[in-house]
Amino acid sequence: RLGCAWSVSELDKRENTASHVLARFRGFIRAAATLITNIHLPNFAKGSIYQGAGKTVCVPGLNCYSCPAASGACPIGSFQSVVGSSKFNFSYYVTGTLILLGVLLGRFVCGFLCPFGWLQELLHKIPGKKLSTKRLKALTYIKYVVLLFAVVLLPVLVVNDVGMGDPFFCKYVCPQGVLEGAIPLAIANAGIRSALGHLFTWKLAVLIAVVVLSVLFYRPFCKWICPLGAFYALMNKVSLLGIRVDAC
C-alpha cells in the first residue's frame, strides 16, 4: 500500500512538472502553432490564398480558410460547407477529426494551438482597466447555442432555391474571417476591395467589438462565443490531455 501511495505521489509530481514545462514554453508553442497554421506568408503580398493539398486537412484551431497564409482548412468552416451543400452530406471526416483532437487534446487546443485565442491574450496584456468574467459565467453557455444553431442547424435548415445553406457562423459571426481573410485580401487585391459591402462592415464591427472586449476581459470570444471552443469543452471531460483549473 505504501508503495502504491508513493507511486501516486510520483505521478502527481510528474504531472505538475509537465504542466510547468508547458506553461513555461506556452508562448513559444502558440507562436509556432500560429506560424505552422499560416506558413504561406508570401501570399499576403500576392492577395491570393493557398489552394494546395494542405487545404484538405483541418487545422485544430480557429483559423480562416480564406487567410492568404493559411496552410489548412478551418474545421468549423469545413463542417458548414459540407452540411450546407445541396445534397447534405454529414461531414464524417471533419467530425471525426474534431473528435480525435478532442479526445487527445481537449481544450489544450484552445490554450496552446489556436491563433485567435493567442491574439485575445495579447490584447488583454494592453495596460488598462481589466474586468472579471466571474459574474458572467452564464454567458459561457452562448457558445453551445452558437455551435448548435449557427454551425449545425441553420446551414441545414435555411437554404436557397437550389438547396444550399449559408455557412452562418463564418459568414455572419466569425471575427477571425475578416481579420485573417477579408482585410489582408482587400488590402492587396483591388478586385476584392471594390466588392466589399454591408456584410464586411458588419463583420468589421464584430471584430472591433471583440478586440475592445479582449482588452477588458480575458479571452471573451473563447469563453462566450466560439463554437470550436464549445466542442472541445465537451470533449475535455474525456480527453487524454485535459485542461484543469487549480482550486487556488
What are these regions (language model features)?
Residues 2-248:
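Non-ligating segments of multi-cofactor redox enzymes
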